[in-house]
Amino acid sequence: VPATTVETSAIQAPSKEAPALSQVQAENTEVPAVAAGYFRLHLKTLPAGDIANLGLWIWDDVEQPSANWPAGALSLKDAQNDDYGYYIDIKLSEKQQKKISWLINDKVSGQNLTGDKNVELLAPAMNEAWVDEEFNSHTYPPLEKGFVRINYRNADDNYDNLTAWLFDDVKEPSKDWPKGAANKTGIGPYGAYWDVPLKDAAKLLGFVLLDQSKTGDDMKIQPNDYKFQDLEHHTQVFVHDKDPKVYNNPYYIDQVVLKGAEQTEETEIKATFSTLAGVTKEELQKGLTVKDKDGQEVTIT
C-alpha cells in the first residue's frame, strides 16, 4: 500500500429597510471595558436556586484555577449585570491563553449544574464570550431565534450606500435588482449590520453586498455570492473587506482544522476535523491535497 500524506491549503424600486431587533438585542448598555489580561464571561441566565449558593468553577488557562471543590468556586452573587444578563471577569494565565474551561456548581451540595464547558480563545483580541440559555458559548451576543445578523467590516469603516441582496432561506428574499436590496439596520461593534428574518427551519443564507453608488458588476463588494450553511447554530455571521468567506466569529478565524488523518484502506483515508459545520463537500475538497509516496497528487472523490 503506497504511503500518503494529507495537506490543508488552508432592477428599480425603493430600497427595503432591514428590520431591527429589540434594543436589548441590537445594542448592549454600556459597561466597563474588559481590563487587559482579563476575560469576560457573559451568562444569559443562571441555574435555578439561591444565587448565594451558585459558583463558577474555572480551570485551564486562567491565573488561578479553582481549588477546594465545591466551595472554592467563584461566587456568582458577585457577578455584574448588563442587558444580556450577568457577567464575570476572569484573570487569564500569563503563560498560555488558548482555552478557558468552566462549570457552574452548587457550592454547598457540590452538584455540577451545567456540565463541563469550555471557551476556545480564537485570537489574542478575543476577551469575551456569551453563554446562552443552554449554557453553550458564542463569540458574539446570540440573537433571538428566527433572525440572523449579517455583519460587514471594511478597512476604512465607510458604510455609505451599502445594501444587502438576500436570498435562499430568508423570510423575504430581495426582489427588483438592484434597488430592492435591504438597507443596513445600523452600525455596530463589528461594522455595518443587517438583521434578517429567516424562514422556519432555515439552513442556508445567501446574500450579496452592494454599493448603490456604483453600477453593474462594480456594485458588488466582491464578485461571488456569500453563502452560510450553519444557521442552526449561529445567529450572527461576519464578513470583511473583499474576503468571499462567511465566518461564524468576529475574528474571521476559519474553525475548520484538520486534526489528523490515517490510511484505512488502499484507496481510503480517514480524516478528522475540528468541525465541519457549514462546510460543503466541494469546499472541503478544495482545501485538501493528497499525495502518494512519490509526492504525486491523488484525486479526491
Language-model features: where?
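Short, ordered beta-strand-loop transition motifs
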Residues: V34-A35, K77-Y84, E144-K145, K184-Y190, ...
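Tryptophan-paired
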Residues: E63-Q96, K171-A201
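Sec-dependent, cleavable N-terminal signal peptides
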Residues: V1-E17
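The feature marks proteins involved in alpha-glucan
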Residues: P14, P19-G49, Q80, K91-D156, ...
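Acidic surface patches and DE-rich sequence motifs
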Residues: D60, D82, D106, D132, ...
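Non-catalytic beta-sheet/beta-sandwich ligand-binding modules that flank or precede catalytic cores
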Residues: D83-K95, G191-K199, L205-G206, Y252-T301
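Surface-exposed loop/edge segments in extracytoplasmic proteins
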Residues: V62-S75, G110-D116, V170-A181, T215-Q222, ...
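Short, surface-exposed alpha-helix to beta-strand junction/turn motifs within ectodomains of secreted
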Residues: A52-P65, D160-W177, T267-I300
